[in-house]
Swiss-Prot record:
This is rRNA biogenesis protein RRP36. The keyword Coiled coil applies. The keyword Endoplasmic reticulum does not apply. Residues 170-193, 242-263 form a coiled coil. Belongs to the RRP36 family. It comes from Meyerozyma guilliermondii (strain ATCC 6260 / CBS 566 / DSM 6381 / JCM 1539 / NBRC 10279 / NRRL Y-324). Residues 1-125, 160-188, 201-267 are annotated as: Disordered. It comes from the Eukaryota. The gene is RRP36. PANTHER family: RIBOSOMAL RNA PROCESSING PROTEIN 36 HOMOLOG. Its main location: nucleus.
Length: 267
């Protein structure tokens, strides 16, 4: 009988064939495909690593909360805050932050202050007593000189024809109003000074008469007498043209009053 003999192959030959076939397959793969495969593998590794870290942190936090439940740490504060929020009723009073700027004006309970006196000058505050107007006018008398010089300057500007041509009608009107306002302010201040001077002289005369024995007691003027005395002093201090204007005004007023009385009598 004839026996068939199977051919024998070495393992080295098989491995060599497999290596050659695998090497041929790697050569056929493009560089872009290899690069994308590497990126994909890298992303998967990073995701796995982050999952492991998160699981470790969660386990550590649970263990820390378990072992540090008695300590005053941030976890306990957060849990207390959440519990307060859960237990707080909707009818509870609103909470406001205490970190607010301090007011410059101190609020005193029971003390009422006017809005216009909050930012006033403390020298004229009624809490320090009544203001001495005579002393104030004496201390700030130099301001009248500045006002007078300013009034003269504005009057020169209005009289200057060249300057008035360069100004617009609106600017000229504003300058005239400012001049009129400043003039009336100076006149009112002069009248106040004159009134204070007249009353001070009358008070001085009454005091001297009382000391010399001419009067048993000083005489205090009534409001009507004071008004007449002040009108007389103002009329005497006026110049001739001003006196004529005042007399003309009084004459017209008296004439109008008489005409109204006649018309009323005819009816």
């Amino acid at each position: 009988m004839n026996r068939r003999v199977r051919p024998q192959y070495d393992d080295s030959d098989e491995s060599g064939v497999e290596y050659e076939s695998g090497h041929d397959e790697m050569e056929e793969i493009s560089f872009g495909a290899l690069n994308s495969a590497q990126k994909k593998i890298k992303n998967e590794d990073e995701k796995k690593w982050s999952r492991r870290n998160n699981s470790n942190n969660d386990s550590d936090g649970e263990e820390g909360d378990f072992f540090e439940s008695d300590s005053d740490g941030p976890p306990e504060e957060s849990s207390s805050k959440t519990s307060d929020q859960k237990t707080r009723s909707k009818h509870a009073p609103a909470e406001a932050s205490a970190k607010r700027p301090v007011s410059r004006i101190r609020q005193i309970p029971g003390l009422e202050t006017k809005d216009n006196s909050k930012f006033g000058d403390i020298r004229f505050d009624p809490a320090f007593g009544k203001a001495n107007e005579e002393r104030i006018r004496k201390d700030y008398s130099f301001l009248n000189e500045y006002r007078q010089s300013e009034l003269e300057q504005m009057q020169r500007m209005l009289k200057d024809k060249k300057l008035s041509r360069s100004m617009s009608p609106r600017e000229r009107q504003e300058l005239e109003l400012q001049t009129q306002s400043l003039r009336s302010r100076l006149d009112s201040m002069k009248n106040k000074d004159l009134e204070a001077q007249v009353l001070a002289e009358h008070k001085k005369q009454q005091k001297e008469k009382w000391k010399s024995g001419q009067q048993a007691a000083p005489y205090f003027l009534k409001k009507s007498e004071k008004r007449k005395l002040l009108q007389k002093a103002k009329f005497e201090s006026m110049k001739a043209p001003q006196r004529e204007k005042v007399m003309e005004r009084k004459r017209k007023r008296r004439l109008g009053k008489e005409m109204r009385q006649l018309e009323f009598g005819r009816k």
